[in-house]
C-alpha cells in the first residue's frame, strides 16, 4: 500500500448526518476508509475542544488515524495535538506536519477554544525549526494545512505565505478557502494542492520516486461525476481504477445512520413557493431572502429593534417545496442561540462598516439583517461605506441605545464583531428552532 490518505480539515461538521451525532459518524467513517491523517479545521472545534481532543486520543489508541496540528497550544504552551507523523514506504519516508488556521480564534464560538492559542504569525515565521526537524527524518515533507489561499483579508495566514517563507516543504495539502486547484500550483519550490469543497472533488498527487528521490510530481482532481464513471478519468490513467463499487460495510453503516436520522429530519414543517437563497457566494456578499428571513425570525422572537447575523452561519439554500426539519438543520448547523444585547447607534454603524468592509470579496461575517434599512456604497473607502441607517423610517441616533438580536457567536465577538460583545440581556432559543417557528407561523403548508 503506497497510498497516503489525508484530509485538510472541517471534516467533522457541516451536514445534518454529522451534526446531529456530534461528528461521531465521520470519525467512524474516516477509520473505515483508512485515512492516515487529518488536520483540525476551525469547524472541527464546533463541538468544543474537549470533544475534539478526546476524539484524537481515541483515534490514536484504536486506529491508524492521526490528528495533526503543530500550532495549537494549551494554556501552558504545550501542543494539544501531535505535531507530525512519519510514514515509510519501502524505506522512502514521508513526514506530514499539521497546521491549523489561526482564524479559528474568531471562526468558532470562543467557548469552544477557551484556553487554546494558535500561534498566529509563528505559523509562518516560527515553523522553520520544526520543518528542519522533520526534513532530517524524512525524504519528503508535506504540510497538511487548514490555512487557505485567500488574499483578500478574510484569511490571515495563507498556505502561499508558508511556501514563500519556510524552506524544506515539498507539498502543502490545503483547505479552508475552498479553492479549486485543478493541477495544483507551484510557489518557490513547494507544490500547493487544494480540492475545493463539499466532496465535489478528490485531490490526488502522484509521486514518482527513484532511489528515494522524487523525480516527478503530478497533482490532479477527480470530480464526483468521474468517480461514478472513472473509466475516462485520471483515475484510470494514473491509478488504474476503471470501476468504483460502494464498499458494503461502509454503505451498511451509512444506511443505518440515515435510518436513525430520518426519524428527526423528514418531518415537514412548512412550504416555500420560492427558492430561499443561502449559497456561500450570496450570503457572504449581499442580503438574501433566506438571510433576511433568519434575521427577521431572530428579531420577532426577542422583540428586538433590529437583528444581525453572520452570512457565514447560513450554510445552504432551501429549494421550492416542502421544508423539512433536516433542511433547517443543514442551513443552520452550528447550534447557535439567539441572544439580545443592548447597543448604541454608533455600535450599529460600526458593525455594518465592519461587515461591509471586505466587499466585493466574500466574507463569512457579512451581515444579514432585519429591522433596518441600510444605504451604502461598496465603492467608497473602507470605513466610509455606510451612508445611512434607518429604523422604522427614522435615522439611527448614534448616541441612542437599541435592542439588537444576534447569535451567541457574534455576541462573543465572533467573526471580529467586537463591538457586539456586550452583556447579554436575554438568551433566547436555538437559531434553528427560531427559524422553524417563524416558518410554521408564516409558511405553514
Language model regions located:
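Acidic, metal/ion-coordinating pockets
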Residues: 1-234, 283-297, 307, 338, ...
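Short, mixed-charge, low-aromatic patches
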Residues: 6-12, 114-115, 159-163, 245-256, ...
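Short N-terminal signal/transit or membrane-insertion segments
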Residues: 16-37, 144-152, 235-262, 329-343, ...
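Immediate post-signal peptide segment of exported/extracytoplasmic ligand-binding proteins
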Residues: 88, 207, 269, 273, ...
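Short, flexible loop/turn elements at secondary-structure junctions
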Residues: 91, 101, 196, 268-276, ...
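A short C-terminal boundary segment appended to hydrolase-like catalytic domains
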Residues: 105-106, 209-323, 412-414, 421, ...
Amino acid at each position: 500500500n503506497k497510498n497516503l490518505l489525508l484530509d485538510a480539515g472541517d471534516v467533522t461538521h457541516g451536514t445534518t448526518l454529522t451534526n446531529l451525532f456530534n461528528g461521531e459518524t465521520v470519525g467512524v467513517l474516516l477509520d473505515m476508509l483508512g485515512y492516515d491523517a487529518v488536520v483540525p479545521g476551525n469547524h472541527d472545534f464546533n463541538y468544543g475542544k474537549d470533544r475534539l481532543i478526546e476524539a484524537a486520543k481515541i483515534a490514536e489508541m484504536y486506529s491508524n488515524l492521526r490528528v495533526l496540528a503543530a500550532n495549537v497550544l494549551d494554556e501552558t504552551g504545550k501542543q494539544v495535538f501531535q505535531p507530525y507523523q512519519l510514514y515509510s514506504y519501502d524505506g522512502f519516508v514521508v513526514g506530514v506536519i499539521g497546521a491549523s488556521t489561526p482564524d479559528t480564534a474568531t471562526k468558532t464560538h470562543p467557548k469552544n477554544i477557551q484556553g487554546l492559542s494558535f500561534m498566529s504569525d509563528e505559523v509562518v515565521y516560527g515553523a522553520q525549526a520544526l520543518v528542519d526537524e522533520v526534513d532530517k527524518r524524512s525524504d519528503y515533507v508535506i504540510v497538511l494545512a487548514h490555512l487557505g489561499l485567500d488574499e483578500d483579508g478574510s484569511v490571515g495566514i495563507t498556505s502561499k505565505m508558508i511556501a514563500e517563507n519556510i524552506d524544506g516543504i515539498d507539498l502543502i495539502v490545503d483547505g479552508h478557502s475552498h479553492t479549486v486547484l485543478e493541477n495544483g500550483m507551484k510557489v518557490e519550490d513547494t507544490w500547493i494542492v487544494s480540492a475545493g469543497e463539499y466532496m465535489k472533488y478528490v485531490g490526488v498527487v502522484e509521486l514518482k520516486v527513484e532511489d528515494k528521490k522524487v523525480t516527478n510530481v503530478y497533482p490532479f482532481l477527480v470530480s464526483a461525476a468521474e468517480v461514478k464513471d472513472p473509466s475516462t478519468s485520471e483515475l484510470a490513467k494514473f491509478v488504474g481504477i476503471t470501476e468504483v463499487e460502494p464498499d458494503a460495510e461502509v454503505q451498511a453503516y451509512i444506511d443505518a445512520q440515515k435510518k436513525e436520522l430520518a426519524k428527526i429530519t423528514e418531518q415537514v414543517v412548512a412550504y416555500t413557493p420560492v427558492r430561499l437563497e443561502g449559497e456561500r457566494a450570496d450570503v457572504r456578499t449581499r442580503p438574501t431572502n433566506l438571510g433576511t428571513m433568519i434575521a427577521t425570525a431572530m428579531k420577532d422572537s426577542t422583540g428586538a429593534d433590529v437583528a444581525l447575523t453572520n452570512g457565514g452561519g447560513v450554510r445552504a439554500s432551501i429549494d421550492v417545496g416542502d421544508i423539512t426539519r433536516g433542511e433547517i438543520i443543514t442551513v443552520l448547523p452550528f447550534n447557535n442561540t439567539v441572544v439580545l444585547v443592548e447597543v448604541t447607534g454608533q455600535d450599529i454603524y460600526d458593525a455594518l462598516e465592519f461587515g461591509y468592509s471586505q466587499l466585493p470579496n466574500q466574507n463569512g461575517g457579512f451581515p444579514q439583517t432585519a429591522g433596518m434599512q441600510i444605504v451604502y456604497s461598496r465603492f467608497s473607502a473602507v470605513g466610509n461605506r455606510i451612508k445611512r441607517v434607518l429604523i422604522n423610517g427614522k435615522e439611527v441616533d448614534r448616541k441612542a441605545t437599541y435592542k439588537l438580536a444576534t447569535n451567541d457567536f457574534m455576541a462573543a465577538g465572533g467573526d471580529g464583531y467586537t463591538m457586539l460583545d456586550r452583556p447579554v440581556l436575554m438568551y433566547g432559543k436555538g437559531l434553528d428552532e427560531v427559524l422553524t417557528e417563524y416558518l410554521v407561523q408564516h409558511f405553514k403548508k
